[in-house]
């Protein structure tokens, strides 16, 4: 065999070996994510930790959109669009996070939150109660009900504009520090709490509660038994326009 023939055979041998390696073991199975992989995207972090100059979008959606217009030395890590503020207050420049964020509660103020802190509850009742993401004991609460201007200014030290046409209703900015945030103003058909609330994106939202309970609340008009439940469990099929209320604590007692 000539040297040319041997060289050609060697090259063909290497090419065939490379093709075999590229094809692998012949397994053409499409690999799906493992059972432990997360199927849903993680909840986005708020682009600010606190905010004094909060802006509410005029879009009538729920949860509403907020933007923080505070000028800061450095934007929060979660901020995606951090822009330089013209004529900033800080030496070396100031920045503003221009992100819009969808949330029920935009969070506490940075410098004035303690001004509205009270050990006495500013409201007699509240439909849209919000527990603040702080860790004191007792907890801190804010009522996000939309009130007539005269109601808000009479009961609260600080009020802010509610989403919607201007001028319009106001929301109390005061923070209550106590164990009991008070009763609802409008009774929910399912009672004071709900673990499985489903709401649309309107503002205010229309909600229903799919909790299976021993008995429906007195305010429920359409109480239906869960099929094949033993002992019997019930679900209130009523719909309610407004905040669904807090989750039930502890869940095991539902």
Swiss-Prot record:
Stretches that traverse the bilayer: none
Pfam families given in the database record: Bowman-Birk_leg (PF00228)
Propeptide: 23-118, 252-254
Cysteines paired by S-S bonds: 125-185, 126-143, 152-159, 156-172, 193-248, 194-209, 199-207, 216-223, 220-236
Gene3D superfamilies: Cysteine Protease (Bromelain) Inhibitor, subunit H (2.10.69.10)
Signal sequence coordinates: 1-22
Database matches in SUPFAM superfamilies: Bowman-Birk inhibitor, BBI (SSF57247)
An example molecular function term from Gene Ontology annotations: serine-type endopeptidase inhibitor activity
Site feature Reactive bond for trypsin, where: 135-136, 201-202
Origin: domain of life: Eukaryota
Keywords, in A-Z order: Disulfide bond, Protease inhibitor, Repeat, Serine protease inhibitor, Signal
InterPro entries according to UniProt: Bowman-Birk_prot_inh, Prot_inh_BBI
Placement of Sequence repeats on the sequence: 46-120, 121-187, 188-251
Record's GO cellular component terms: extracellular region
Family assignment from sequence similarity: Belongs to the Bowman-Birk serine protease inhibitor family.
Name this protein carries in UniProt: Bowman-Birk type bran trypsin inhibitor
């Amino acid at each position: 065999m000539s040297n040319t023939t041997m060289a050609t055979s060697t090259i063909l041998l290497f090419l065939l070996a490379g093709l075999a390696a590229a094809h692998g073991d012949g397994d053409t199975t499409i690999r799906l994510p493992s059972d432990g992989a997360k199927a849903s995207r993680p909840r986005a972090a708020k682009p600010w930790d606190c905010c004094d100059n909060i802006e509410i979008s005029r879009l009538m959606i729920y949860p509403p959109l907020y933007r923080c217009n505070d000028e800061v030395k450095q934007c929060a890590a979660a901020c995606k669009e951090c822009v330089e503020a013209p004529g900033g207050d800080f030496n070396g420049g100031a920045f503003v996070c221009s992100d819009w964020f969808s949330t029920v509660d935009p969070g506490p103020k940075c410098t004035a939150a303690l001004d509205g802190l009270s050990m006495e509850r500013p409201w007699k009742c509240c439909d849209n109660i919000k527990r603040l993401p702080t860790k004191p004991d007792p907890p801190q609460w804010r009522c996000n009900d939309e009130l007539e201007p005269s109601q808000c200014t009479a009961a609260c030290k600080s009020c802010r504009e509610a989403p919607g046409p201007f001028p319009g209703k106001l929301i109390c900015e005061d923070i209550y520090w106590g164990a009991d945030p008070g009763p609802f103003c409008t009774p929910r058909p399912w009672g004071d709490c709900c673990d499985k609330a489903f709401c649309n994106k309107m503002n205010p939202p229309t909600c229903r509660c799919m909790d299976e309970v021993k008995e429906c609340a007195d305010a429920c008009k359409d109480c239906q038994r869960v099929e094949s439940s033993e002992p019997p469990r019930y679900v209130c099929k009523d719909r309610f326009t407004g905040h669904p209320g807090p989750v039930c604590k502890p869940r095991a007692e539902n």
